[in-house]
């Protein structure tokens, strides 16, 4: 399969989230469960395997913006070549800050998400995702400052 088709199937799975159970998205169908690498921005870091990814990023992110909608990005760039694919959006999604994130309590604000994702596939599964998020702008969009995170007032990293 072309990496774009594998990626698109995974994105459709993200839309199946029932708001409670991560398995409702069936990510195990799309990722190499044991060997996947997810490399995120400074505040999250490198996660290996689906379990670690879901525990340290996906579950927290979904708590932060459970109503996320990635179909609303104004400017999207999508490309794929063989076993690689990329997706960028400015903004990448619309959402509402509804849960604690990096120690920031929800205030109902609409965070801005500028994201660039780069994926590698190994046949039928995604194996790598380099996910770059403008965290400084994300924090500012919910009226928080980067320094609050850096000063150690918040603890997110495992």
Feature-to-residue mapping (PLM):
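C-terminal and inter-domain tail/linker signature
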Residues: 1-158
């Amino acid at each position: 399969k072309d990496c774009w088709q594998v990626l698109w199937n995974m994105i459709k799975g993200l839309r199946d989230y029932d708001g409670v159970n991560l398995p409702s998205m069936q990510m195990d169908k799309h990722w190499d469960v044991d060997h996947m690498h997810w490399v995120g921005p400074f505040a999250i870091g490198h996660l290996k395997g689906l379990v670690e990814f879901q525990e340290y990023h996906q579950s927290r992110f979904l708590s932060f913006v459970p109503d996320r909608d990635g179909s609303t990005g104004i400017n999207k760039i999508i490309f794929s070549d063989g076993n690689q694919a990329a997706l960028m959006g400015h903004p990448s999604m619309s959402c509402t800050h509804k849960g604690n994130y990096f120690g920031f309590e929800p205030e109902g604000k609409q965070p801005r998400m500028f994201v660039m994702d780069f994926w590698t596939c190994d046949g039928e599964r995604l194996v790598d995702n380099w996910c770059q998020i403008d965290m400084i702008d994300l924090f500012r969009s919910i009226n928080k400052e980067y320094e609050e995170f850096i000063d150690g007032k918040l603890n997110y990293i495992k």
